[in-house]
């Protein structure tokens, strides 16, 4: 099957899938189950999600059945979960496997403190997107990690403080310089590695 082929290729490369998504979820339990089934078959513990309000009863049943986490992703200004408080409200009182995927760049764009987000989500943080923007506004320009608003060392210190899970999804995200991003991505990786060593 295609799933088995993907698993084989990942294994041969020494890689594992840490997350999938961002998935939309509704109250349609059968459709939601298909996403969880794929995650389980891929050996993935984390599904990044933008769930509708009416999806949470279904999601609670599925996270318990599959032991796969939901990590609510913030999409920036004007999105359903663009503020830290929006995600905290959504996960309050829910199964602890329903938590957050903090896209740090989008929190910058929403004028929220990315390090504060990590600390507030605490042990409900299952995904982090390392991304930086030049300024805290909706149409801000993306920049190489550490050259904008993101304090990368403080991010890693906060991740240590909240005991970010070893099987959580820590992703580097860079969307600029589409025609030739390799040098910029290498610079982002260097900053991330340096910050991790200093944290």
Language-model region placement:
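Histidine-acidic metal/acid-base catalytic patches
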Residues: 85-102, 108-199
